[in-house]
């Protein structure tokens, strides 16, 4: 009861207070709530600017004239659910703006009236009045819209005092009803009549009069366990004249099946177009012949029977089913009734809307021919249906536009044929057991399709093109990729929330250009390059992605887990293979051009060759063993050169070699011979006593005949040890073809042996000398202490003017 009262109070405040509040849009509203505080009197010191005061659910038993005197701005006063026994309306004489007064659910027995011209809502229901608390002052409240009354006796004379008022709602909240004068209710002038009945009330008379009273009639708490219609069992149900009600609502009804049958028969011949019964329980023995129901002469369009509970009764269910389906009206709802089956007459009916939700209907309901040519909406939600193709064959004989088959056990096999009407545009197939094969059993002209919470893994490519589809809901399935729109070219809304989508497909971006709304949140996204276009879509398409960006979070890779997609940065170059290749090619071309420029401008190849030679020499020196040093040598190096290059040898080569510590022993050509020895013997002796031999190569060296013998001697003398003991210095370029064929040794050396090239650029000389010193880096076994440099020169005129100079340091 408290729940009903709360709804009623809320609705009344919305209609009464807000309609008056618009007159003072600039004034500040203040609500003070003292409800459920066990107060025994109205609190003192209330703020004068209070506009709404709630004192409900307390222990107030008396109101003083001074309680609300200071609240000149008060508009809403709620005093329901207290213990007030007497009410003097004059208590509110200083509350000129009061428009809403609720004193329901108290213990009121009397009211002292005072004119409150501004009152719009007055509720005195559920009190202990002996008669209805209505006076002449009540009739003077010209702005009154909602009036709540209660009383043990209801008489015509009471309502006549307010018959001239045009009321919106009248509430009769009755605790007891000992007397009702028939014909009293029709005196009221109200749009809506709301009656809450006490136990053991003559419901029949109130229903009879209520239908004549208001456009909307709602009756609550109908308890007819013992039928009150027994006096009519052998009589014809009277036809009501002057009926006004077009909407009849019965709530919390407990009655026998015969009572329900008679209520329907009574209402059937009235002005009622919409008849709703909620929370109904019926059963018991059946006495009336239900085949005698008179279906003629009615304006009924809609019947709703919701939340039905059965007591044990002895009646064939077929009679119940046919009682409703033979009514042949536009709209019929029987929901939450635990109904296992439904029968239809053999002839065509004019039903346009059928709602059998929340029952236990099975496929058997479609196994008999059903003729519903005008049916446009069918709701079979939350039943036990299993075969989609069976439903399709039933629907093919209708004009169905909207079909709800959600929360069933439906499946579809590929070998089952489906036949849908061309008119079907909306289908709800959610919460079933459909797999991918369901796409082979869809109506061609479907526009809105809901397949959420099924077992769909992919959208098959070999399906019928649904060219009219506008909205597709695939949420809570098992998709691993965003589906493409190749078969849904006009798709505008796509929902794939809560699937197993890791990345977006290329087909989606190529074929879903028309999609305006996409919900793909709460999927385990793999934030790699495959998802880059999808991330860009979310960032730059305003309002398209539902739930962006809180519902779009990376699941893989692990280093990005928990990161929102909007915070993931995937560079274009790392995801675009073509761009990456072009970039690499461009970079390589730039580097190649830079290297070429350096080679031309800085002679880089020469530096590289010299660096390579120095490295090779350094490695060879490190590999040199003490066994290789046991050779009996007195000089570090023997220098062979032509007379033409002597200036370079004396002023460049020798000073650079001696520059380090002066301990280098050099044997070189100078022009004097050693007495007693031939030039050949002296040359061989110098080569044998020198650890390494340097040959300064130039065109003049090649033209000197003696210079070819010196490489020959050195080559053959050191060949058994290593070519590493021969050092070639190319002072000037010498093409190999310029070397005469009669001197193969020099050509062989130049082909096999890497040589040091003297740079023309003086800035490169440092690297040249470093390479040369590295090549000469070895300690003589018998060199100790301080040595004195001696020079030996030999001249041999018979060999073209070449010279051998021995520069030696003797040990002290």
UniProtKB/Swiss-Prot annotation:
It comes from Bos taurus. It is a single-pass type I membrane protein. This is Toll-like receptor 10. Residues 599-812 are cytoplasmic. It is found in: Membrane. PROSITE patterns: LRR (PS51450), TIR (PS50104). The chain crosses the membrane at residues 578-598. Residues 633-776 form the TIR domain.
